[in-house]
Amino acid sequence: MINSPLNYTGNKFKLLKQIMPILSNQSDTMIDVFCGSGLVSLNSDCENIVLNDNNPVTISLLKYFKNTPSDTIITNMEKIISDYGFTDSNKNGLHYYKEEKHEGLSRYNKEPFNNLKQDYNKEPTIEKLFALIIYGFNHYIRFNSKGLYNVPVGKVDYSTSLRSKTKEYAESFQKKKIEITNYDFRDERLYQNKDAIYYFDPPYLITQAPYNATWKESDDKDLLDLLDRLNKKGIKFALSNVVNSNGKTNKALIEWSKKYNVFYLDRKYLNSNYRKKNITIAEEVLITNYKEVEYGNEWK
């Protein structure tokens, strides 16, 4: 399975073995409307993919991986690591550094990270941004209201594992015909291919991740109405969402879903918020308007 060095909230990597059998053999084209890192579509059996997101930063990152050889991406990262003095466990081994309990490598990387963050906010480049994501807390991609990157330093560095993910992820862009677009999900330009399967993984109305903060009930309604219109046109769709989370229920989604096919997915969310040490159960679903699936089949 292809994984990504980019950590987007709601990343579907752990659910791919459950999701992909439902999406497989539906079309040779997938339109990934809220693509994030694009893991679902990149792992699909579709030869043609449209990666769409309304976030211009996401689009810039996707284009970087699509248009830059993997070795160049890694070399660019190595130069930043050297120039700023970040830890390099791939080169030196973790034993070279004395990790503090609960802090990992953060004490070594705090000053280099803050220097890089300052330089990026003055003169942004995609190479600097990728380094900030790797060395930032939980690999978050977050900006404040002034457009400045404002994630604190993280606990890990550009490890051997992350280098492998970088290489695999970048090379996956060369194995399919990929178009990258930057439209709002309501934009009709996205829905011109009646033979494609459309995959939606929007922000979740009832979860508390910062990514979901700007998503309102009106957005949820607009999306569900759009899906109904696609269904009337005979266009296949699959929607990832959450129906219950931390005592909250998306009643409108549950009622709407009764018209379609609902697959319940098994995932336990390990809450990474340092203020909460618990594992929370979110009832995540995949909703489709087609039935031609062999659910539960082995998928690799």
Regions found by a protein language model. Name each.
Residues 1-34, 39-40, 44:
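S-adenosyl-L-methionine
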Residues 47-175, 293:
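Class I S-adenosyl-L-methionine-dependent methyltransferase module
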Residues 217-300:
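Long, positively charged, glycine-interspersed low-complexity recognition regions
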Residues 182-187:
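Conserved SAM/SAH-binding loop
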Residues 150-156, 204-222:
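Mobile active-site "lid"/loop adjacent to the S-adenosyl-L-methionine
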Residues 188-192:
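Short conserved loop adjoining the S-adenosyl-L-methionine
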Residues 28, 49, 197:
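Hydrophobic "anchor" residues on beta-strands that sit immediately upstream
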